[in-house]
């Protein structure tokens, strides 16, 4: 007995496959055939789309031209509507994409006429551009605020040793203290210093020059850990202590935390000769609810 099926051959090895597009690799062969000659085992016909395409993006309805969806070849949308992949339709015949459609209109506006979203939508539209693999849109969004500024900020943070690890430590310490004390908030001490070299409490050039003449044994006395929960520094960049504090507040707030901080003094530990550690100490207050 010979059993003949209508299963489509693997089109990934056919001459018509998009070998250069990563977007198309995300799709599987059609779960439901678009056109078959049942019982004869013949290849499936490509799915055909109308010139004007009705869309259902996660429940949000849009209508656009097929040429708009295919404007850039190496994108997920161009691959989806190339005819090589089966796109399901809803009860009204709209082609369905299981994705939040809140910002899909901004994506369509770029494909239609090159329009860019307002600044407050840039981050969200950038996420959609990544999903649909729209390179030209990604490139332009990354040259807009706030993404352009974020690139500069990350370049600075890249010079900061263990920044992410220390940030996580702040959150974990604050959480543990709040739980242990059954408190709404927790406080912790954070040292932020740009320069490794401690300074004297006196503005005296003679005393300051001593730091360049210290012995190796004296050098060990300069290496100490301030009595704080977390320390940030040193770093080599124009950005100063206040810039790093701003980064800390920004990243902690992005996790949904309420953050307050204030300088409560300096370490002031005596090191050697006339030298005292003058690294600033900040008190961070993390409020959980």
UniProtKB/Swiss-Prot annotation:
Protein name, UniProt field: BTB/POZ domain-containing protein KCTD7
Main function: May be involved in the control of excitability of cortical neurons.
Domain BTB span(s) in chain numbering: 53-141
Cross-referenced InterPro entries: BTB/POZ_dom, SKP1/BTB/POZ_sf, T1-type_BTB
Region of interest called Disordered, as start-end residue ranges on this chain: 1-42
Keywords: Cell membrane, Cytoplasm, Membrane
Encoding gene (name): Kctd7
Record note on quaternary structure: Interacts with CUL3.
Tissue spec: High expression in brain, particularly in post-mitotic neurons. Expressed in the mitral cells of the olfactory bulbs, the hippocampus, the deep layers of the cerebral cortex and Purkinje cells of the cerebellum. Not detected in astrocytes or microglial cells. Also expressed in heart, liver, spleen and kidney.
GO cellular component: cytosol; plasma membrane
Keyword Glycosyltransferase: no
Biological process, per Gene Ontology: intracellular glutamate homeostasis; intracellular potassium ion homeostasis; membrane hyperpolarization; positive regulation of transporter activity; protein homooligomerization
Upper classification of the organism: Eukaryota, Metazoa, Chordata, Craniata, Vertebrata
Cellular location(s): Cell membrane; Cytoplasm, Cytosol
Gene3D superfamilies: Potassium Channel Kv1.1, Chain A
Transmembrane segments: none
Organism of origin: Mus musculus
Organism superkingdom: Eukaryota
Keyword Acyltransferase: no
């Amino acid at each position: 007995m010979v059993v003949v099926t209508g299963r489509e051959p693997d089109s990934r090895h056919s001459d018509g496959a998009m070998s250069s597009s990563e977007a198309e690799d995300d799709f599987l062969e059609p779960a439901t055939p678009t056109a078959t000659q049942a019982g004869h085992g013949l290849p499936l016909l490509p799915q055909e789309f109308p010139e004007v395409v009705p869309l259902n993006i996660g429940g949000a309805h849009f209508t656009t031209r097929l040429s708009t969806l295919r404007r850039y070849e190496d994108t997920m949308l161009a691959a989806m509507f190339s005819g090589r992949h089966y796109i399901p339709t809803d009860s009204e015949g709209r082609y369905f994409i299981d994705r939040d459609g809140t910002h899909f209109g901004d994506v369509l506006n770029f494909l239609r006429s090159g329009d860019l979203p307002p600044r407050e939508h840039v981050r969200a539209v950038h996420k959609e551009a990544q999903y649909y693999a729209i390179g030209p849109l990604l490139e332009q969004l990354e040259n807009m605020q706030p993404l352009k500024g974020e690139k500069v900020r990350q370049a600075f943070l890249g010079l900061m040793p263990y920044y992410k690890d220390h940030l996580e430590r702040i959150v974990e310490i604050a959480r543990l203290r709040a739980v242990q004390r059954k408190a709404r908030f927790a406080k912790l001490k954070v040292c932020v210093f740009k320069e490794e070299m401690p300074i004297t409490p006196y503005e005296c050039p003679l005393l300051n020059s001593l730091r360049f003449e210290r012995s190796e044994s004296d050098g060990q006395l300069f290496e100490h850990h301030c009595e704080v929960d977390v320390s940030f520094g040193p770093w080599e960049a124009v950005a100063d202590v206040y810039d790093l504090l701003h980064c800390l507040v920004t990243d902690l707030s992005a996790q949904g935390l309420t953050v307050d901080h204030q300088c409560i003094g300096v370490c002031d530990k005596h090191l050697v000769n006339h030298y005292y550690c003058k690294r600033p100490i900040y008190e961070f207050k993390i409020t959980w609810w």
